Amino acid sequence: MSTSLVIDTSTSRTIVGLVKDEQVIWQGFHDGATDHGNAVAILAKQALAAGVNPDRVVVGMGPGPFTGLRVGISFARAFAAARNIEVIGICSLDAIVVDQSSYTVAIDARRKEIYWAKYHDGVRVEGPAVNFPADVDGYIIDLYPDVLRLVQLSHSQNVSEPVYLRRPDAVATADRP
């Protein structure tokens, strides 16, 4: 089996965990939409203090706010490169665990919008997408990605690029319309 350092910064919560052979060794989080940069390093250090060395990194690839995603993905890639281990990307919405047959998960997209996806029996059937909450049918569940679920999904998916569903707020002058 494997030992995974798990990182997700797709929501206002920075999530870091250490999972060995499908057992959570350590997990922690920090709430703060503008503090991912500090939080991910502190949480990763705490995870590594458990004394178990990861042989791969599993990272949530969004959807999520541009800056938050970049922080987590960049940290994951740099950590993996320094240790010469693989990085596996996961759609963060897929890692939100819900005990229902049909449901919609959503996370705050700011600007009064949500990133959302619909699921049936744990399989994504629609999305991810970004809309106003009133434009999304169904009961919306607002939770956070689960560390163990991110690792479980790493056996069946590998998202190579961040899931950005809209342009960032800040763009280079040359790229402005």
Locations of regions flagged by a protein language model:
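Oxyanion-binding and handling regions
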Residues: 1-24, 31-39, 82-177
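A short glycine/serine-rich beta->alpha loop
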Residues: 27-32, 61-65
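Phosphate/pyrophosphate-binding loops at sites that engage ATP/ADP/AMP, CoA/4′-phosphopantetheine
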Residues: 44-56
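Short glycine-rich phosphate-binding loop at a beta-alpha junction
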Residues: 53-62, 136-142
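DPxDG-like acidic metal-binding loop motif
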Residues: 56-87
